[in-house]
Amino acid sequence: MLVVCASISVHAASPINCAKITNETERTVCGKPSLLQADARMTTYFEIATQLVAMGQRGDLQDSQQAFPALRNKCGTDKACILAAYKKQTAPLEAVIANVVTHGPF
């Protein structure tokens, strides 16, 4: 079992704040529990993954995460498109975590 304790950097991975919706895509995410769950999963995986990689790769992950809202927002209110965007963004983060679990740095 892997236990990860990490200080969390929220500047690049803040989840959607449903009290401060700024566009129709965020409104769609906030109105659909499965999309909110996808947002929370992506944010959590980002926070963990950035603590497990070297600085160069961390910067790449941060750049990708900062660009994500603009890509997601191109979906408008299309729930399937939004979910696909979250899955595409989350996949490399999951891969980082899986790689550490199977190969370690330990």
Q: What does each of the following model-derived ranges do?
A:
Residues 10-106:
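N-terminal alpha-helical modules
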